[in-house]
Amino acid sequence: MPFNHNSKAKRPKFLLDLQIKELVNIPQSSGYCYTKWRLKDGTGTSGHKVALDGEHQTTSTQSRGTTKHVHVQHHRAQWNYSLDKPILVKLHLDKNGRFLKKILVLDVFFEFADANSSLTSSSSPNGKVKKTTYANATALTATGNNSYSQKITGKLLLGTVDIDITEYVKEDETPTTNRFLLKHSKVNSIINVSLQLKLVRGSYEDFNISKSFTNGQLANYRPGINTILDNTSELSSPTSTTNQMSPKNTFSNFNGIGTTVAKPGTNATGNSTSIKSPTSTNHKSSEMTTKPGLSTTISSSMSPLIESLYQKTFKLPWDPRPGEFTPRECVEDILQGGNGWAKNEKGINLIDLQALRLNEMEEEYYNPNYGNNLGNKASSWPPNPSDDGYSTMGKREYLEKKQNWSHMSRAQRAKLRTHNDEDNENTANDKGSDKDNNSVEDNNPTDFLTDRIRENKNWSIITPSG
């Protein structure tokens, strides 16, 4: 393909139309989501009007923006955000006529909402967000598109997406919609974005158009059963039917609430809509009228079912350690910057404290003098069965105790255990064989240690032996 070396041909201009539609697979079922977008290195333009198809069109040179803050419903945030005016963007070419990358960055944020508090919306004509800082939380109130009714207790960056807009240059200039998995994220949320580029300066013969995408778009992805129902309800019926809907039919959704469907053939404005059937019994195209909002009604009635199925994934039977998080609590902790493990009031992981306790008991059994060493309180910790010491142990005390039982190497531990086993065996032989074997077995220190370990590992599944 010939490449024009004209200076302007190396810098074609396009009108960028951006749409940010929705975010799906959000772990939380409540809260707020919004997206910030920006073009790296700006737009490279300064004009506000271009001549397109013989008409002057007003454009924008903004290189960043923000969607509205929307409430998360059924683990989905729907913005349907679009630009008021297309953005005039200047792209650059290399010596081979290929586009240099122009990156569009999307930053997706999630805001945690306190369900126990509510705020009064202030009257603002432009719908701007008002921020009020409290001692431990930030309360946001807004009107217009941003509808806050709860106190915002924290903000979290869910993830980012980098899109090379030069890959969306198409000669037919049709919009392209893709789904992107969030990067630098701990969740599998997917954002739906649509891009369209229209050439306003230069010619398509001046550059090479990319034939593929390299930004990790998800192809042929369906976010859930709601979208499947919406799409299938719009498809044509494969065969004609004689079953006609009554003037007013009522069916129950999954909440037990009756939903009324208006008479087919008329919508809310009185205009009829129809779906053509490709085949019929008399080989003629027939028409079946339906209400255009029916698919939306079915989709809405399915939402509680989807919610229920989603919740059940967090309630699978399992055997957690005492005091540990449930799967839902684990996800919440990770999203708030934690590691997914429950902690005591001093910030020490309970699983680490449990491991310390088991190792101390093991060391105490194999080394009788371990608890009598200076500065070592292993035999007296925890002080009583009702106080496990988890809520009071700080980081310093934990590190000191951990160092006390880890001062010996693994080989030294094994040698000490072998020596103690031989001493115990010789002592048992000296006692004589006149004692009852059952009594000796009941007072065996090994059984006592096993019982103590099982008491602390009550989360383990014990399979009964045959």
Swiss-Prot record:
Keyword check for Ribosomal protein: no
Modified residues (Phosphoserine): 433, 439
Region entry Disordered, spans: 262-298, 374-393, 400-452
Biased composition (Polar residues): 266-298
Residue ranges annotated for the C2 NT-type domain, each copy included: 4-199
Tree of life domain: Eukaryota
UniProt KW keywords: Phosphoprotein
Family: To S.pombe SpCC1494.08c.
Miscellaneous information on this protein: Present with 396 molecules/cell in log phase SD medium.
PANTHER family documented for this protein: C2 NT-TYPE DOMAIN-CONTAINING PROTEIN, FAMILY WITH SEQUENCE SIMILARITY 102
Protein name (database record): Uncharacterized protein YBL086C
